[in-house]
Amino acid sequence: MRFPGATHRVITCKSVAEAKAAVDTARRILKQLGVELHPQKTRITHVQEGFEFLGYKIKRGQRQMHLPESMIRSQARQGALYAYPKEKSIRRFMDQVRQRTKRTLPLKTEELIPELNPLLRGWGEYYKRVHVRQLFNRLDRWILRRIWSHRFKRWRKAGWRWLPRRKLYGEYGLVRLAGLIPSLAF
């Protein structure tokens, strides 16, 4: 019996022995339910190496502290867990944006943006709660260049000055990925 998507789990343990015992226990319980663990997808790894899960890369990072060791009261950030989109997810998103902003598409900018917005909003909403501020800013700039490039190809005399950012985000309603991050609402 298969339950796609219903059995995605991450189990954290303090030691390798504890992790192996947890996998054995999970196998026994799932066998009673008529379900089995996928041998290629089930693995034990150290969080320092990181792992990929549901489109995210999760890893323990060593955050650079700008204060001397004596001034740091808490070591909570030294070994913090960081999650960010997988490279494959980012590439797939960029490919979808490329498909919708092809320079040969016979669309005006006002027609192109409503085609692009659902993709931007959906992808941005899924990843907005992890460490993506720099990534979203970079992707926002890249999307602007794609739109400007599309417009310039269609109308050679219309340079980027004729289509400023405030017009794209304001009048045309282009979704800004960085604006989806809760602490950065524009």
Kindly label every feature range from the protein language model.
Residues 1-186:
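Non-catalytic terminal/accessory segments
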